[in-house]
Amino acid sequence: MLGAMFRAGTPMPPNLNSQGGGHYFIDRDGKAFRHILNFLRLGRLDLPRGYGETALLRAEADFYQIRPLLDALRELEASQGTPAPTAALLHADVDVSPRLVHFSARRGPHHYELSSVQVDTFRANLFCTDSECLGALRARFGVASGDRAEGSPHFHLEWAPRPVELPEVEYGRLGLQPLWTGGPGERREVVGTPSFLEEVLRVALEHGFRLDSVFPDPEDLLNSRSLRFVRH
């Protein structure tokens, strides 16, 4: 296994690839794996402050049978205990831009009719100082990559639900796309501001935040367009 490759005196079979020249190729990469390689090189566990993927790192270490790394992870977790949530701020706001879209609808073999429908485009801006919570929000909305630079607390989304009157071909031609949430088997479309902010509220509460302010009407959460959460 991987640990044996870095230990002297461990017999290893020769490379079966005649062009390999006796070198081994490690077919693995990722944020967790870099810490495994650092541990094997340096002989110590050196994780960045606030590292929150020890469970994934432990699973990788167990898969590769790196017992010293497993022991180091156990010592780290025992020394840390249950970490207390750190103070953080989460702000989410949504704007909607309606527009009238005109298109030709086919009503018969040689009969076309000019139709129009309103399409609402939603733009959501999220700001969160807790990177773990921000990552959970991205995962909740199925965003694998986006315009959020590495380490930035900002996250932006834009989507436009398709009205039933608008043909799918016209919807695609306009370059519009829906927004979905939920896991496999329970996916549901985010059709407007209330459903989007409801998902944000769920994630915020799961990460220890509490609702601090509602805009524009503090008494009307369901029809709000901006929410602010804090965690002390």
UniProtKB/Swiss-Prot annotation:
Domain BTB, chain residue ranges per copy: 1-49
**Tissue distribution:** Higher expression in cerebellum than in whole brain and lower expression in medulloblastoma.
Protein's GO biological process: negative regulation of neuroblast proliferation; negative regulation of smoothened signaling pathway; neuroblast differentiation; neuroblast proliferation; neuron differentiation; positive regulation of neuron differentiation; protein homooligomerization; protein ubiquitination
Supply the alphabetized keyword list. Answer: Cell cycle, Developmental protein, Growth regulation, Transferase, Tumor suppressor, Ubl conjugation pathway
Entry's Gene3D superfamilies? Potassium Channel Kv1.1, Chain A
What is the annotated role of this protein in its UniProt record? Answer: Plays a role as a marker and a regulator of neuronal differentiation; Up-regulated by a variety of neurogenic signals, such as retinoic acid, epidermal growth factor/EGF and NGFB/nerve growth factor. Induces apoptosis, growth arrest and the expression of cyclin-dependent kinase inhibitor CDKN1B. Plays a role as a tumor repressor and inhibits cell growth and tumorigenicity of medulloblastoma (MDB). Acts as a probable substrate-specific adapter for a BCR (BTB-CUL3-RBX1) E3 ubiquitin-protein ligase complex towards HDAC1.
Q: What is this protein called?
A: BTB/POZ domain-containing protein KCTD11
